[in-house]
């Protein structure tokens, strides 16, 4: 069966369908990771995005039940150059086609992914519609025009947990973390628990519930959408700055910058992949990191808050981390849990978070 991808600027791509027979609208983005497609599919930060993988062969290792980053697939659509129909891995329980079909997500293979990625790189991430059910192009254009886009969208509330729950409860915790969930990945919680920390997760819709007695620090996790749309959580975070150590990852990095009084903005095509170079400005050490975001922190506005940039993305020199000692804030834009991705920052940064929660400067 044929499939079609229409971009808001009129560009058109055709290919073959896999996954669900349906039509979905979203934001067209690309990911440069060579592997880890199952983590990408189930990462809540990809809510309402149609993801194109730059690696040519996808699906080689099949699907397993251990690598999912949440309870469901969050991407709106999945685009690949070549889909593997014979996955091989000792953990595999099935193939990518059936996995997406059972979850109602359309896939498209055989399109010129290189041309698409170069187009998005030059023109920027944009609205799109992907269809595998034969809907007419006129109807697809109508659906595309009705989709509101990402700017101003508070998608974090749609993927957050509904009530507080405990992720890790050791007998003698090294530190007690309250985590704000606006789409946090399972591996962040797992690895934070591996440091010996007590971890209690709270919905980002009710951040005040996290700021209770007995908590040593707050971690604000990753998530989808426009950070500037989360005015309620930003205000709640502002009220706790300076009272408790607060650390942030990805969306949490952006929300903490807003809470300090800085501004955020939409990146042209974002940073999505497991090969993103970041320099630690304190040591000069360069780490290859995993990233997934479409918004960044505006440098001049952050500097005006008194925060100090600790990490810089070497591809475009955007801010990848900052600290504000006076407000007890430490945040990074990248994903230290590295799922998928390299482990350059994995143990170092998570243990820095724990030490920061214990009152030791990062």
What residue ranges belong to the model's regions?
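Amide-donor transfer/coupling interface in amidating biosynthetic enzymes
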Residues: 35-38, 44, 58, 63-93, ...
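Short hydrophobic/Thr-rich beta-strand motif most characteristic of the beta2 strand and flanking loop
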Residues: 198-204
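Gly/Ala-rich beta-loop-alpha elbow adjacent to hydrolase catalytic centers
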Residues: 248, 252, 257
């Amino acid at each position: 069966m044929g499939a079609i991808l229409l971009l808001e600027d009129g560009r058109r791509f055709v290919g073959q369908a896999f996954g669900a027979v349906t039509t979905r609208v979203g934001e067209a983005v690309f990911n440069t990771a060579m592997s880890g497609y199952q983590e990408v599919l189930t990462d809540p930060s990809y809510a309402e995005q149609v993801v194109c993988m730059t690696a040519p062969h996808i699906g080689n290792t099949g699907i397993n039940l251990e690598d999912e980053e949440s309870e469901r697939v969050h991407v709106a659509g999945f685009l690949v150059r070549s889909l593997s129909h014979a996955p091989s891995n000792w953990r595999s329980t099935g193939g990518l086609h059936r996995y997406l079909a059972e979850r109602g997500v359309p896939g498209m293979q055989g399109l010129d992914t290189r041309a698409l990625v170069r187009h998005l790189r030059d023109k920027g991430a944009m609205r799109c519609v992907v269809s595998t059910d034969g809907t007419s192009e006129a109807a697809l254009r109508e659906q595309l025009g009705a989709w509101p886009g990402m700017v101003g969208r508070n998608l974090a509330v749609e993927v957050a947990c509904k009530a507080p729950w405990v992720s890790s409860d050791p007998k003698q915790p090294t530190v007690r973390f309250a985590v704000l969930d606006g789409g946090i990945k399972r591996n962040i919680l797992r690895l934070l628990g591996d440091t010996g920390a007590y971890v209690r997760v709270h919905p980002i819709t009710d951040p005040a519930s996290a700021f209770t007695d007995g908590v040593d620090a707050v971690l604000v996790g990753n998530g989808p959408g426009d950070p500037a749309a989360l005015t309620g959580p930003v205000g709640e975070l502002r009220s706790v700055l300076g009272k408790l150590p607060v650390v942030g990852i990805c969306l949490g990095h952006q929300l903490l910058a807003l809470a300090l009084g800085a501004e955020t903005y939409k990146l042209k095509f974002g940073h999505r992949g497991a090969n993103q170079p970041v320099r630690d400005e304190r040591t000069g050490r360069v780490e290859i990191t995993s990233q997934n975001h479409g918004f960044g922190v505006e440098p001049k506005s952050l500097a005006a808050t008194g925060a100090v940039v600790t990490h810089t993305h070497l591809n475009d020199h955007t801010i990848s981390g900052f600290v504000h000692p006076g407000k007890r804030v430490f945040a990074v834009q990248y994903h230290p849990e590295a799922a998928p991705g390299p482990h350059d920052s994995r143990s170092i940064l998570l243990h820095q978070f724990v030490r920061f929660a214990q009152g030791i400067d990062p």
